[in-house]
């Protein structure tokens, strides 16, 4: 495991707390965090180091949270 991957994994619990607070659903939160970690690990070069790693990951997570809400609101309306 690379140092970058270790740093990302170290932040997973903080990302989970944020996602749970926003979504109020553990399964949805876990999905959003997993998608965030995957996106970060697939393109580590996207992290330019201009901010803290946590700030960058939370930015990705916010987009994934919106995706989760959209996905589940569509399912609820079906």
Identify what each model region corresponds to:
Residues 35-53, 71-73:
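Sigma70-family region 2
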Residues 48, 59-78:
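Arg/Lys-rich amphipathic alpha helix in sigma70-family domain 2
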Residues 25-26, 50:
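Short loop-to-helix capping motifs
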Residues 1-17, 21, 27-30, 41:
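A short, charge-rich alpha-helical start-of-domain segment used by transcription regulators
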Residues 7, 11, 15, 36, ...:
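Residue-level preference for hydrophobic side chains embedded in well-ordered alpha helices
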Residues 31, 35, 67:
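Acidic active-site catalytic centers that drive phospho-/nucleotidyl reactions
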